[in-house]
Amino acid sequence: MENLPSLLESIYTTWLSLSSTIWAMDMILAFVCGLGLYLLLLPFLESHLSSSPSDINFTRKPQIQMTWQSQYMKKFRNHCRNDAKAWEECLKKLKEKEKDELFLEEMSPGHHLNSLGNMFNSASAKQDSTTLSPFWNLKEKSEEQMATQKLSYPKISGDHLQEKYDQLYWGLPSLHSESLVAAAWIPQTTSTLPSPFFLFNVISSVYPIHLQDKMSPVLPHTHPLSYLDLQPPPLILSPLEFQSPALNQVHFQSPLPVLLPSSLPYSRDSGACYSQSQSKPHCPTTEIQYRERPLVTKQLESRLTLPLMVQKDAYSILASNPSHDWAVPIFPDNFPISCELRDKLEQHIQKWFIQHQWYFPPEIQESEEVMGLQNSVTGNYQIRDQPCTSQAHMSTGEHNKQGQKVKFQLENESCKNLGPILGKGPKDPVKGLEKNVVKVQGANILEPERNLVKHFKSDSRNDSSNYIDEDLENNWKANFGTKSGQINQGLTPLSMRQSWLAMNDSFCDTDIHMETRNLTAIKSSEKFMCSREKLAFLNPETRQTLEEHVVRFWVKHRWGLPLKMLKPINLFKLKSTESLPLTLCTQPSSTNSVHRTNSAVEVVRFLGKPCLRQIIIKDSSPPPGNLLLVSSPSCKRAAIRRPPSGVDHEPSVALPNKPQSAYLAETLAYNFMETPTQSGGVLKDEMETEEVLLLPRMTCAPNLRAHNPQAKVVSEYPYNVETELTGQPQIYTTSVLLPKHSRSMPLPVDTLTSNALGDIVMVDGGNGLVQQRPSTPKHQVSQKGQIKMLVPTYQGEDTKRQSERKYEDMSKFSPVTERKNNFENQYYQTLPKTTQVLPESLFQRLLSRFLPRVHPKKTIKGQECHPQKDNPTAATAQNQRRQVRKQPYMDDNVTEAQKLMTTVGQMLEKKMMQHQHHASKVNQPRVVPPGPTSWFSHGHMPVSCLKRRRPPSYPANSLCQRRYIQGRHNRGQLPQKSVQFSQKPQILRNPRHMYPKSALNVVNSSQNRTTVPRTPNQHLCCPRHCAFQRNVCRELGHPSVAFPNRKT
């Protein structure tokens, strides 16, 4: 060692010299360094080269394969050439980490997926290879090691455990093809025996530690069960506390995601499934050990014959982290229940999942102790048309001290479910289910079962143990053979396939056709009991909220849908809302209730989508001659035709038959072709939006005083529109009276087109059809409740002015007749029967409002008002209906201007009367009394003023009197304006809105009214009032001028 520095120094100087041997020395030195490095790293290289590429593919994370040696290799290459001290440091670090590296190599998944022989040898290298004692005698050592373990890679596993836990809990099939990230366990103390390494969906070849001392005597060709039951003492799987060999066999047959949801408070931490049972394991008898050892050896030897997919999915190691650092709550944080109820529910769910994770035949469940508990135990069942999980529940009993008998019993509280857990289940357990044969296309799974049965029989002959029942063995063999065959073919077990079939029947077509048959019929009656008896600690509101919460999770993951949701979804796929038929008048009119079909209503209620094309019309008190007409592009129904005259007052209503429906359909088609542009556009919009229009009814009344029923649209749901009739009288405003038609005649073109404009058609018993124009009701329905929409009435300005002005002398009638005539004149208006007037369009209404403002003195075409001659015989009590012409539309400003001019005329008339009484005082100034402008409007005068009116008692100006008489003579030929005086004083409207160019009216007083003929070009030639009259006309040109009381 002392010569080493000098040797290195000489080598260094030689290397730097320019001798001829420098290249040879370099080659020798490089070879020596490479050889030493190879020998140093040879153990590490062997461990990595031993794992095959196919086995390495099972690991999901490449960082597991990347070890820390590669990092040190890079550092070594960079620093060893520059500094010798770096070389020594690297060697020291490699020696310190050598032990840990060996441990990581043994823990790596690729190393354990080598082969069965390597896995077995590496696991039992320090123990006797001639016996299997490590499988049974390492209980104490494993407990000590598990107590000192800690998780060294929380980031590697913690990021994925929470994500995978939801899949484990809800039974998602993704875990069947995916694996969780491995979590390494490193002991705190330097122990030669490493701690077990836990993986999900991969095979771990840790040496056999604390394998369940209870091994199954008969193992399938696929599973060495000794490597599957690594678990800590506080978390012991209850089915493995040595039950019968059948229990252990079936427990490890199908590593399913459906099995893993049975998670307990500890299973939330690591995503694994555990039983709640924390009882200590019991040591098996020597007979069981003797029987199991040769079987385990044979199964281990035949392991390599299985496909890789089975090796990957079958060897799921169930492990957990006792800590609650990664706890995933079953319920949301804001779930409205208390902490105590939350704990109870979590325990309840965990028990249910554990009890429902395996599908054993009912014979395995039954025992002498369970027969008395059949009423309280719920078993699963399976119906061919109703896919349901046929799950058997079992829990393990306790061994007696001698270990001579195995007891099987069921949990007292089983089949509690949320969604399906909180749903319903059969009351009695299933009996007589001996064997389930599953046939898959292109797969024959009977051979593994036959071989297994033969193998089981050959071992059972050599063993003279009597603690296992023969019937139980036979039942187990049939069930286990089926599942082992499925696993050998690389298929998922029956439990997951049933869930897939339930989903595929609703959403997609399955590629694998299966047929499940029960060789024995179900003897027990299918009685259901709700979970209310089991979950008595929850109130109904909390239970309903909990069910909705679970159902939303299952629907979100599209897996494990409750059965109550599959049926409506299937119906929705078959019958969409677009193909639902239109129901119109399908029930007789005498029925007041509506019968709905279950399928359509359930689909609509479940999905919450409105069915706008289904309409049901209901009549509570149908009057005679009702017309129920629905015009829809999808279905054009027949209207109820009007009965003959002899049955006008019958209360019954006939439904439309086929000929009437066809006739009305043709009429509707014809009317749609002849519809005007504006109405046709509205109908076209209705066709595009597929909105159903509900036209009013045609009612026949004996006289005009009969009230008209009011249409009321009641909607309870969007797909149910009901129309009722009320007996309250409704006021309708009449604008046009159509000529008479036959009672059996359908609606004309104008009637159909006026529907879009809001017209309502009524039938008068004697005068024909009355067309009204109320505002169009909007049949908009709400899903939250019943909204009653009344057909509103519309009273236009024309009718208001008609009600204010009377053209007849009301003093000639009695008070009763006067009220009748007022009512009729207010609500009814007729035209000559020989003419037919089309409804006034919106454009015409706007035009009629605009033209009077532009040309107030000109008469609008179509609105001429012919003078009505005074005919005292026309206003008798026998005539109960009067023919009134349509009042020409005039603006409010023009009306106020005319009223103002009437008031001015009254003032002039009063002045003339005063001039007659005081003719002798012509030269004296006169005081004009206050005008009635501020107290009276519409040309009304108090009665006292009318009584003081007298005919002129003195000779007036001849020219003025002659022109006054001439205007009175031509009163019947000129347009006139009649104003009736009222006893109540009225306030004059704002004079600012008066029209400035109104013509001056000459006033003629009568007994109860004043007639003002419109003479634009004529003026009274009164010498005193002509100037005043011109001043008034001049002031009218200024709308802001007020009219105070004047003195002359």
UniProtKB/Swiss-Prot annotation:
This is Spermatogenesis-associated protein 31. Its main location: membrane. It holds the Pfam family FAM75. Keywords: Cytoplasmic vesicle, Differentiation, Membrane, Spermatogenesis, Transmembrane, Transmembrane helix. It is a single-pass membrane protein. The keyword Secreted does not apply. Coiled coil: none annotated. The lineage of its organism: Eukaryota, Metazoa, Chordata, Craniata, Vertebrata. It comes from Rattus norvegicus (Rat). May play a role in spermatogenesis. The keyword GTP-binding does not apply.
